[in-house]
Amino acid sequence: MAFGWIDEQAEARRRAGLVRVLRPRPAQSPLLDLASNDYLGLARHPEVTEGAAEAARRWGGGATGSRLVTGTTELHGELERELADFCGFESALVLSSGYAANLAAVTALAPFGSLVVSDAGNHASLIDGCRLARGTTQVVPHADPDAVRKALGTHEGPAVAVSDTVFSVDGDAAPLAGLARACREHGAGLIVDDAHGLGVLGDGGRGAPHAAGLAGDPDVVVTVTLSKSLGSQGGAVLGPAAVIDHLVNAARTFIFDTGLAPAAVGAALGALRLLRREPERAARAREVATALHTRLTAEGLSAVRPDAAVVSVRAPSPERAVRWAADCREAGLAVGCFRPPSVPDGVSRLRLTARADLTEEQIEHAVDVISRNR
């Protein structure tokens, strides 16, 4: 059999407790949700769902082609302008996913002969971007500007440092100001993925780069996703107009991919406009994360202090993490379960995502369920 080796890998996963399965969710779930990335609770907001429905009625179910052919609607342009303005950048480019946005930014901005300095804790999409880039990649220790500075000092020619702004496993924030200084000293660019910062950090949720004073910096490029705080789907790259124009002409995941569906664009626009009107949602998401961490720690659990909306609780083994998450589900609570290879240090975790719309009673219930089922 051509794919007989798959059976061996499946058995190895089973022995290691690393089997993953799909679990379709119903339209109306009875579970309290601390597993999704709907940080601001906007995915089902009437303005967001109506934005999606109206866009589909007006523009159709799909984009019908790549962005360079028929896949760019007037709605795409609106979202790009409003997103760039909200985050404080000159220009923006919408792609079909946050994954595609990261591939676009890294591959198009790391040409042959360049150096890419990548944080050891980066998301898989940034790692894949580094693998596909024509430059040479050097992985440096996690959240270490001095290591970035040292790596950049060994190279002559184009260079970029690449990092998440908020790391998805433990929810810790990157030292963006320090990274920017290291890049500036060596004339390097900085590419950061703000998937977990947009809508949560910065003034009114404008993102981690905005909070660090890097919004609009000509040497900083930011990628974001529309599928977390904005409750939709898709991704975008933000930066100087010259960089965005370069991506339009050089980024393969933009050029050769079908444009983002109008419904997703409409939903993201609705969420972005709602966030502008209700900036307190960002602060509330952070408050909920802090409350979860404080109370879980008080229960004797090993919870990592959150810098944004992700709260990580360490488990003793992959098998125990799976059982713990399953027990929580049986008790009416949905939590994330992260195991190798999704965790960079090999330590399995429950991952909780704080939501701005959680009540005090729901926070207490979640902590009680997690603690009782440890």
Predicted segments with their positions:
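Conserved N-terminal alpha-helix of the aminotransferase class I/II PLP-enzyme fold
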Residues: 50, 55-97
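Active-site phosphate-binding strand-loop segment of PLP-dependent enzymes
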Residues: 138-192
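PLP-dependent enzyme catalytic core of the Aspartate aminotransferase-like
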Residues: 42, 46, 50, 54, ...
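Amphipathic alpha-helix from the class-I
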Residues: 265-283, 294-301, 317
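Active-site PLP attachment segment
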Residues: 210-246
